[in-house]
Each structure stands twice: as C-alpha cells, then as structure tokens.
Amino acid sequence: REQVRGGAGALESLAGRVAIIELLGLSHAELCQRAALSTPFLPTIHWITAARSTAQTRWLLMEIFQRIWLGSYPRVNEYGGEIRDIFYRSYIQTYIQRDVQDVLKVTDQLAFHRFLVAVAARTAQLLNYANLAQDVGIDNKTAKAWLSVLEASGLIFLLQPYHSNLTKRLVKTPKLYFLDTGLAAYLTKWNSAASLE
C-alpha cells in the first residue's frame, strides 16, 4: 500500500485511485504512424491477407534491419542512430546502478552486465538456466533470480510453450525473448544495422 503526505501531514492511501498500465516499446504500426488503422495480430489467412492489402509500402531488407537495430523506444526512433548508443548505455547504467542494485543487492555489477549480454544473445532461443549460468560464471539459483527480475521489469518475456496436454505445457521449456530489439542489438555489440545482415 503506497501512501503520500496529505495537506496537514496526514497520510492518504492511493488504494482504489491508481491503475498500473504496462507499456511496451512502440509497435511497428505506431512507428509508421498507422496505429489507428491497425488491428491486433491474428494468425489467420484472412488477417494476413487484409494486412498485406493495407500495407502502404514494401520494406527493403536494410530498412527492416534498421528498425531492429534501433529498437522500439520513442526517443531513439525520433533521433535515429546518432543518439542510440548514448541512450542505451545510459539506460543500462541507470538500470544496473539503481533498479537492480535496489532489488537484488548485486555485489558484482560486471557479472550482472555479462548476464544481460548473455540473455540478449539468447533471444528467441529455448531457455537453459544451466548454460546461461555457466557462461556467466554464476550458479543456477542466481541465474533464475536475475532472470525473474529482468522479466518483472519488462526487459524480457518468457514465452511458455503450448501443448494440448496441460501437464506437458508446464514441464516444457519456455523461449526467452528480449522485448526491445535495439537493446538486444546494443548489448550484443551490433554496431550498425548493416552488421545484422
């Protein structure tokens, strides 16, 4: 329960007056300024056909790599590559020095940075705690704790597998996704959109 000071020093609860809205980076439709025209993705032939017919332009492969390299943060897309490295460097420093330090009490910030890089390098792959921990030089328990903080803070998403059998769904391995492609590219040292090619 959060409390703030009222007028005469009284404490007032914010319960019932606050909503938490999770915002991800800008979508492709938002970056193209077509968000009002877009509908949520559905994996159907009808949706794909309709989306293709309303697409304004075909993208060149290098334009797609540029979009991946920049990521989905509004400021980076507004100014482009000229501020990208400064933005992501500052973002990582702030994230590690403030948020992570407060939550995890990480004593080895270099190890945590290596962990971030290792996670970014594994985007869209099956999650393997043992390999991740071994590559960074930490134990599995620490890798799980650190990964849960990355997930809770909106840096990554764990896509749980689908299976018609609920038991199999619970024991199968999830895939790990970095939510911002620009941050993943920055951490893995892709220095330009052309380097993604």
Can you name each region flagged by the protein language model?
Residues 7-9, 54, 143, 163-164:
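A generic local structural motif
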Residues 2-5, 25-29, 163, 183:
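Conserved nucleotide-binding/hydrolysis micro-motifs of P-loop NTPases
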Residues 1, 22-27, 128, 179:
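A secondary-structure boundary/capping signal
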